[in-house]
């Protein structure tokens, strides 16, 4: 039962990536990446969550959620500005490689700061790997 909110947050993220992936070959109308960006903002806000913790343990989930939102959200904003197949595909890749940051945010929110940082640190590695092997 404790894991349900985190699972729903990851499911919402996965939904945004899946919605974009349906248009990564043909491109999309600009409303799709705008809608998924709105969903991503909600996911980031939910993942950051309210915390009763103090100090860096309270700041860490917010910082990681900001990192997630910046990385994935920027790609969606670019796709909204120019919703061709390449930009939509790039947004899908950003969503896939941004998942470890989201998971790290959720871990940090529960108080597992070191685990959260370790998970989030996988995101840059994933981005490097995607340059060699397609994420999709």
Predicted region positions:
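Short amphipathic, positively biased membrane-proximal segments
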Residues: 1-136
